[in-house]
């Protein structure tokens, strides 16, 4: 009989930077994994991403924050207001904030090239929702250094728009997998939703799923680990607070 616990304990793990979270996922996220973080506006998705990247910076790891919802400058200010200062790391070249304009057809190629060309250790994509809801335009896909097996059917011309949600998400996930980084992608959810993602697909493609929820009437927040590859974890929602320094489990 295979000793599952022994196999799990030997897996390299990457700390999240969130106090209390690593304790319930056996020390951190599996290295080179993709974790989906879903939740409504104001639940702390971007903050969790800030903490994840700052933990990497402390270890001299190269980090990338790809944003589609907010300009990079606004995110840096938001983080600083929480006591999370990225400016020294930006000056040292340890992290890059990149705003992606989803109105441009080259957004997918630009995203994939950035992820694959710089040997990043940690990557955040905040959020995946706009990409999953727009037509996809694949130009010069053969120039991208990713595993293209089963990515696009052979009978689709390279210049064709493919309004296929699964294709959008598989392209994004394949780029992240090919980079050998540890990554977090976020997804927007309505308040009170029981879904794991807005698109209903990315939770199956990701290695892990963490949900953040709000209860405005009780003035409380929760975090739950719904899925984590090769990890023993509880499904019980954990109470969290957001304070100076970010999210903390209580």
Name each model feature, range by range.
Residues 1-6, 10-12, 116-118, 122, ...:
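Conserved P-loop NTPase
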Residues 16-28:
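Pre-Walker A adenine-sensing motif
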Residues 35-38:
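Short hydrophobic/aromatic beta-strand immediately N-terminal to the Walker A/P-loop
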Residues 40-106:
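Conserved P-loop
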Residues 62, 94, 119-122, 178-186:
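Loop/turn-to-beta-strand initiation segments
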Residues 100-177:
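Phosphate-binding/switch loop-helix module in NTP-utilizing enzymes
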Residues 177, 182-245:
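Phosphate-binding/switch region of NTP-binding enzymes
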């Amino acid at each position: 009989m295979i000793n599952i616990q022994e196999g799990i304990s030997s897996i390299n793990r990457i700390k999240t930077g969130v106090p209390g979270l690593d304790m319930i996922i056996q020390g951190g996220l599996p290295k080179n994994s993709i974790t989906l973080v879903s939740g409504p506006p104001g639940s702390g998705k971007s903050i969790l991403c800030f903490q994840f990247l700052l933990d990497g910076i402390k270890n001299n790891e190269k980090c990338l924050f790809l944003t589609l919802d907010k300009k990079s400058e606004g995110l840096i200010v938001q983080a600083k207001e929480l006591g999370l200062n990225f400016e020294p790391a930006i000056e040292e070249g340890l992290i890059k904030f990149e705003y992606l304009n989803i109105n441009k057809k080259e957004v997918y190629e630009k995203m994939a090239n950035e992820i694959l060309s710089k040997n990043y250790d940690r990557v955040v994509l905040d959020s995946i929702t706009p990409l999953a809801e727009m037509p996809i335009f694949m130009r010069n896909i053969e120039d991208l250094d990713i595993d293209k097996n089963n990515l696009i059917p052979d009978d689709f011309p390279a210049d064709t728009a493919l309004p296929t949600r699964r294709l959008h998400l598989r392209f994004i996930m394949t780029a992240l997998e090919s980079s050998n980084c540890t990554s977090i992608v976020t997804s927007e959810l309505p308040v009170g939703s029981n879904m794991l993602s807005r698109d209903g697909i990315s939770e199956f493609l990701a290695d892990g799923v963490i949900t953040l929820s709000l209860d405005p009437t009780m003035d409380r927040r929760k975090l739950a680990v719904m899925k984590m590859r090769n990890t023993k974890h509880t499904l019980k929602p954990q109470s969290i607070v957001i304070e100076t320094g970010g999210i903390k489990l209580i």
